[in-house]
Amino acid sequence: KCSRVAQLEQILPVLSMLLFFSGNRKDDYMEATPYLIGQLLKASDELHALYCKVVRNNQIPPQLVGSALFVAASETPGRTLSQLSVRMAPYLSWAKQYRTKNEDSSGLAGWYLKVFEQIANKLATAYAVPMRWSDAQKAQLFIGYLASFPKQEKQDESNAE
């Protein structure tokens, strides 16, 4: 599995360069719907895995919710978001309750909820899902799925003083 992660980490810069040279700039595509849906799928995987660790005694299925819907997202993005909302509902509900408990991973559950909220807020302003995506949009989806989550903007708070 580690070699797969290493391979994916090598692919990400190549895809980013291809998008750059085709006129798709990072600052633009990181706010675009395909990238954000990729991030949503990634967040879904992470929350699902946390749920399995906490509730199912570390019994993690071979395929998590986000990765199970990744191919469908590249083919029928609107339908996939609908499916994702249904499949993630129990995990999101669990996280909302679990984050208030004083347990080891409860803070992480709250952090994932915050990630979902940030992505949803961006999607609310950028949401435009065509019936099919172009190859460039599929690349943005993939990059969004592989990219790390945005860091907390603590510098902005200290600069505001």
Report each predicted region and the residues it spans:
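Intrinsic-disorder/low-complexity detector
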Residues: 1-161
